[in-house]
């Protein structure tokens, strides 16, 4: 009998990623170190995944990921950065009767069931494949974007302020929003929490150029799409500000942000088009907040399917630094998690040690040899 495929690789730290460029510490950040609480300075370990499950094989073998994460007693939570099925798989035809023939009405319930098998709190932020892109031909025109987003919210966020998996309290924007912007209350999926000296937040930032690629066919509705993008992006920016405000107020030593979109995906820029342009307001706001915070910040994303780690804003004239026209921000690190059917299928084991100047270290844990062929 073959043993389950499990291996650990790519043990990485920020200092290994870039030794000298991240030696920074503003006076405000240094002052925060005087507020250390011995009981809350312990290292924090979380699991991160995304673009999962991306095919029938991964769904049928979901227990491999669940069991691998559950077996790690150090892991305190799981963060899923969106896309619960492939971009070539159908959506649910939510609120459309009779259902679109090529749709899969019960799919989200299957994923919800798998999330509930984790013995850890599960924090999930939606990806474009489960709502934004449902109107595309490659997804069989199997759902209206806003209907699908509403369905995702009703399935995965039915209890605002509570995680999936092992129920644990988090702050949801639906309950903690600026009353000046009442439409922010709809974003139940944007959540925030603090563990020890680390503030975490998730934002609904999908692919498809932040949902600005035109909805097609019978689902075309430019007015509704523009309203969606405007309200969600505004809410995201305010939630991002709230996360850093919380981090400074509570003397956090690090901040971790989770989104779906790869806002620096080189494949999205060609000689004739720039499908990253509508992330610029988010990246510029992030750059300003990270610079002001002064401490280490980690951005987690999926979307482009292949593991990678970089510091995208360290050099404002570099390939990544020049895309969104920000100042140089050396204290931002970014990790793209392995996903889709990229072999091997892996989850990211992230450890944050607030006692260290460079607190982030991580390793990839493989649980399926080749998700396009076989997990054995």
Predicted regions and their residues:
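A short C-terminal boundary segment appended to hydrolase-like catalytic domains
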Residues: 347-376
